[in-house]
Regions:
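N-terminal basic/disordered segments at the start of proteins
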Residues: 2-4, 22-28
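Glycine-rich beta-to-alpha transition loops that act as phosphate-gripper elements at the mouths
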Residues: 25, 81-87, 201-213
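Alpha/beta enzyme core
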Residues: 6-12, 16, 28-53, 61-76, ...
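Extended, intrinsically disordered, low-complexity segments
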Residues: 244-279
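Hydrophobic alpha-helical scaffolding
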Residues: 24, 148, 227, 231, ...
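Cofactor-binding active-site loop characterized by glycine-rich and histidine/acidic residues
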Residues: 58
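Generic enzyme active-site microenvironment
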Residues: 22, 82, 134-136, 204, ...
C-alpha cells in the first residue's frame, strides 16, 4: 500500500492509548523482518534509517532508502519510512527528495536558540513537501555517555519548543539512554504525563532498548506514543549469529546464519508490536 503519513499513524495510536513501533534498519534483512512482523500481527510499523546507518553504507542514502520505500509500498499494513537522528540538514533534504515521508532532525547537540532556529527551517521545507518532522529536546542519555537523573525534559520548555518550531512529534528525555544492551532503565512516568499534558504533539521515546517490558507498557499508558528500537534488535540478531558460528566452524554460507538472525528480529518485532498494542 502507499506510504502512510506518520502523523496519522501517531494520532491514531495516541487516541487508542497504544504505542507505535519504530525500528531501526542497519541491514536490509532487518527491514524485511520488520515488515514481515508487522504483517503477521496486523500492526502499523515505521522503518527507520539513521544517519549513522547511512554512513555505514558508504554515505549513500539512495540504495537502502529506495529498498525501504519499495518494501513499504508492497506491504499489506501501514508503513512509514523515517530518517532517524539526522544532524545534517542536507541529508534531511535528500531524504525528502527520495520520498521518505518523515524525518527526525536532531539539533539537540546545538545551543538551544540555534537548535530551535534550524529545526524550524527543516520543518518549513519538510511541510512544504508534506513530510512530517520529529525533533529532540533535552539530550537523551547515552549520546554523551550519560545516563543520570539530570537528563530530563521540562514540560513547559517542551511546549514552547513545539510552538517555536512547528514539529509534528517530539522526542523527550525521561530516563532512557541510547545504546543500552541491558534492560534496566527506569522511566519517569510522572514526567511523561506532565509533558503529555503540556505538549500538543505525540511524544517519542528514544533509547527504549534499555527499558523492560513493564516499563514500556507504563510509559505508553502515561502518554508515550512512538517507540524507537535499535540496539535491542542488534543484540538479538548478533546473539543468534554468534551462536551459529561458534557452534559450527564449517558454516560459510551467510544465509545459514544471517537468515536465522533475521528470523529472530522478525519474531521480536512481532512480540514488541503486540506489547505496544497492549495485547
Amino acid at each position: 500500500m502507499p506510504l502512510v503519513d506518520i502523523r496519522q499513524m501517531a494520532a491514531e495510536a495516541a487516541a487508542e492509548s497504544v504505542g507505535l513501533g519504530a525500528f531501526n534498519v542497519v541491514l536490509l534483512e532487518f527491514a524485511y523482518a520488520q515488515v514481515q512482523a508487522a504483517e503477521s500481527v496486523n500492526r502499523p510499523v515505521i522503518l527507520q534509517l539513521s544517519q549513522n546507518a547511512i554512513a555505514y553504507h558508504g554515505g549513500r542514502l539512495a540504495p537502502l532508502g529506495k529498498a525501504l520505500l519499495s518494501l513499504a509500498e508492497e506491504a499489506t499494513v501501514p508503513v512509514a519510512v523515517h530518517l532517524d537522528h539526522a544532524e545534517d540538514v542536507d541529508l534531511c533534504r535528500a531524504a525528502v527528495d527520495l520520498g521518505f515521508n518523515s524525518v527526525m532532525y536532531d539539533g539537540s547537540h546545538l545551543p538551544d536558540d540555534e537548535n530551535r532556529e534550524t529545526t524550524a527551517r527543516v520543518v518549513e521545507f519538510c511541510h512544504a513537501a508534506n513530510v512530517a518532522v520529529e525533533a529532540e529536546l533535552g539530550e537523551v542519555g547515552g549520546k554523551n555517555g550519560v545516563h543520570d537523573p539530570s537528563a530530563r525534559t521540562d514540560p513547559q520548555d517542551a511546549a514552547q519548543f513545539v510552538t517555536d518550531t512547528g514539529v509534528d512529534l517530539l522526542a523527550v528525555a525521561v530516563g532512557s539512554s541510547h545504546a543500552m544492551t541491558t534492560r534496566g532503565a527506569v522511566l519517569d512516568t510522572d514526567l511523561i504525563r506532565d509533558i503529555r499534558d503540556a505538549v500538543p504533539v505525540p511524544l517519542v521515546l528514544h533509547g527504549s532498548s534499555g527499558v523492560p517490558d513493564d516499563g514500556m507498557v507504563a510509559a505508553i499508558e502515561a502518554g508515550m506514543t512512538k517507540i524507537n528500537v535499535s540496539t535491542h534488535l542488534n543484540v538479538g540478531f548478533t546473539g543468534v549469529v554468534r551462536d551459529i558460528l561458534n557452534g559450527d566452524e564449517t558454516v560459510v554460507d551467510p544465509r545459514k546464519y544471517v537468515g536465522p538472525g533475521r528470523d529472530q528480529v522478525r519474531d521480536e518485532v512481532a512480540r514488541l508490536l503486540n506489547l505496544y498494542a497492549r495485547r
